[in-house]
Amino acid sequence: MCIRDRPRPFVFSLSDPRGTGHDCSLIFYDNAGEHFEPGIANEESPGTLHVASSSGIFFLFDPIASPEFRRALRGHEDPQFGMDGSGKRLDQQDVIMAELEIRVKQNQNISIAEKIDVPIAVMIGKCDILKDQLDWERILWPVKDKKLDLDIVEKNSEILREYMMDMHPSIVANSEALSKNVRYFPVSPFGHSPERVELDGQKYIAPDPDKLDPVMVEVPTLWMLHHVEPELLPVASGT
């Protein structure tokens, strides 16, 4: 018997205040980058097939895995830069994005020169370590009066895109070769660098619960919802 590794769906139910008939479910899949390694056929990695029929795609970029970012951030105090083996593994994030493009277009039976309309949110993770690099005062919170301000989303995305073009242009090129609708988002689940801890003689790094302050982690999903189910999410007037 052949057992294949498949991503499990995360299902969330949304209730609309307008009542029955407007409720919906959101289904998320979390794919590892290894699922999109070049040379692996769809038959060998069937867990990637759903991506071609998804209503939206999220791509999480890890700056600490990138040699370009590591050079720019040399001397940063984040302990993740000093972990054993950190920086020695091959950074394939641009290759994974390129392979994602190939898989999606093959499964949709479209030309490699065509682009899909499906929105892609490119999330720049661990953005708290990039605040000095990004001129963080230019990055604004895009939710105003319980509405998503698309103008702010656009401006934030332009700042991130410009930065990525300088630091890792292949991510931008490969993302925009796949979709007509790509936006870039700064996110950080912890909002601060983890700290070194020792437990039972073993050394670890972990976030400090007292310092947890997530950065814009909900914004990519709000933007995606605006495209997938626009009636569920009000946007600021004039956008």
Predicted feature residues:
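Short, small-residue-biased leader/transition segments that mark boundaries at the very start
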Residues: M1-I3
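Switch II of P-loop NTPase G domains
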Residues: R6-G56, S66-A72
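Extended hydrophobic secondary-structure segments that form protein cores and membrane-embedded regions
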Residues: I27-D30, I57, P119-K126, N181-S188
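Conserved C-terminal guanine-recognition region of P-loop GTPase G domains, centered on the G4
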Residues: G47-L148, N156-S175
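Extended recognition/assembly regions associated with phosphoester-bond processing machinery
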Residues: G85, L100, V104, Q202-P209, ...
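Canonical P-loop GTPase G-domain recognition
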Residues: I129-L225
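Structural and coupling elements of P-loop NTPases
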Residues: F185, L233-P234
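Long, low-complexity intrinsically disordered regions
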Residues: E231, G238-T239
